[in-house]
Amino acid sequence: MSDPAYAIQVALVGRLVALATEAGQRVYDDVPSEEQRTSDTGEAWPYISLGNGQMVPVDEECFDRSSTYIDVNVWSRDIGFPQVKRIAGAIRAALHEKELAIAGHVLDRMRVENIAYSRDPDGVTRRARLELLVETQPAI
């Protein structure tokens, strides 16, 4: 079985950057410091980060399939939740039941399973966490 997680991440980053949301080019796996984000892009907030994930093999007799879960997080310091909700909505519209070219794999289905909104313990930062399910099989 070929683990599609990295190929999915590469494809997702490309799609998220191309969306041109309020987060702009600030799409990260390993989030740089606030100072570095500002230096690189002119602003530190909002940004998108790829978070926790899990790959579950789906062993079938006739083919090899995977269900990959990945969290896509939206972070904002705007007052209230409007900004994270706008960005999360744009992400859902771009990913839910849409096509995505994943190197070495065939996409069977991609779904945003849920979106959770929360206030960070610092009392200032807002977060939207989208749980994405990507079902794939190796390209033959």
Indicate where each model-derived feature is located.
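Short, solvent-exposed beta-strand/turn "edge" segments of beta-rich domains on protein surfaces
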Residues: D59-R65, D120-T125
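Short beta-turn/strand-loop junction motif enriched in small, turn-promoting residues
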Residues: M55-V58, R77, Y117-S118
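Acidic-leaning, charged glycine-interspersed low-complexity segments
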Residues: A18, E22, A93-I140
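Small/polar-rich, solvent-exposed N-terminal microdomains that initiate assembly or binding
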Residues: M1-E60, K98, I102-A103
